């Protein structure tokens, strides 16, 4: 089991030969988490991708988990696997693209929630879950205007309905990402809410809706919805200098 190195001499030996290293005060991480929680009043899904932004996936996740966090977001499947093994009661949203049967088997067998935006991916998860005699947990990514990955918002309701008809798929939620442009972000939120409303009008329950990451946590309270995804702000960093002293 992972144990932190706290002895300065041990740290010095471990970092021998390296010109620099990063140190994190976990009390500050707890402080930032508490402030975000008190601000938004909804559930949080911390972003711990890329080895928790270089701070250490397991120690950061452990600290947040001990504070009651249960949802985590990662970009790579191997990180989702590590979290599910280390913290079996946790829930992990994996953004990775899946290639090959072993990846689908791992997602289903570990109980990882997979980001889905193609019918082929949904069908393969369904077929894999059927072989495992279980259900695959999915979050559907909706493209509301960022134009990276996701189901286009105009076709999203039909897509979501088709995915939810697969017998071994369990919908955990819908999510999208902002452009971080004030005028366009309002339109993106409107599109996302329209998708969620139309899906629910069709009788499909949406357990979690998520739009807000770091910037929206500070500037768009109407986008907090059911769960927010704090990223850099958890680690004491904000992309916009004017927000450094925001309460």
Regions found by a protein language model. Name each.
Residues 89-98, 113-116, 135-139, 228-231:
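Short hydrophobic/aromatic-enriched beta-strand-loop microsegments
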């Amino acid at each position: 089991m992972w144990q932190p190195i706290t002895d300065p001499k041990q740290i010095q030996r471990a970092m021998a030969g390296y010109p620099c290293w990063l140190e994190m005060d976990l009390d500050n991480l707890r402080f930032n988490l508490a402030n975000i929680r008190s601000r938004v009043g909804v559930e949080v899904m911390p972003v711990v991708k890329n080895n928790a932004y270089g701070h250490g996936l397991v120690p950061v996740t452990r600290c947040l988990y001990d504070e009651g966090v249960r949802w985590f977001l990662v970009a790579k499947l191997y990180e989702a696997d590590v979290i599910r093994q280390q913290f079996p009661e946790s829930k992990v949203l994996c953004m990775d693209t899946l290639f090959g049967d072993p990846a689908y088997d791992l997602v289903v067998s570990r109980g990882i929630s997979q980001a889905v935006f193609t019918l082929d991916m949904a069908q393969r998860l369904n077929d894999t879950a059927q072989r495992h005699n279980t259900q695959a947990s999915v979050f559907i990514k909706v493209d509301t205007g960022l134009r990276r990955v996701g189901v286009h918002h105009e076709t999203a309701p039909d897509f979501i309905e088709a995915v939810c008809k697969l017998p071994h798929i369990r919908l955990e939620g819908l999510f999208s990402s902002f452009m971080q442009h004030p005028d366009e972000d309002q339109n993106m939120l409107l599109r996302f809410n329209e998708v969620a409303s139309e899906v629910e009008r069709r009788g499909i329950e949406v357990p979690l809706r998520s739009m807000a990451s770091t910037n929206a946590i500070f500037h768009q309270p109407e986008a907090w919805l059911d769960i927010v995804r704090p990223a850099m702000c958890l680690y004491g960093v904000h992309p916009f200098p004017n927000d450094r002293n925001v309460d």
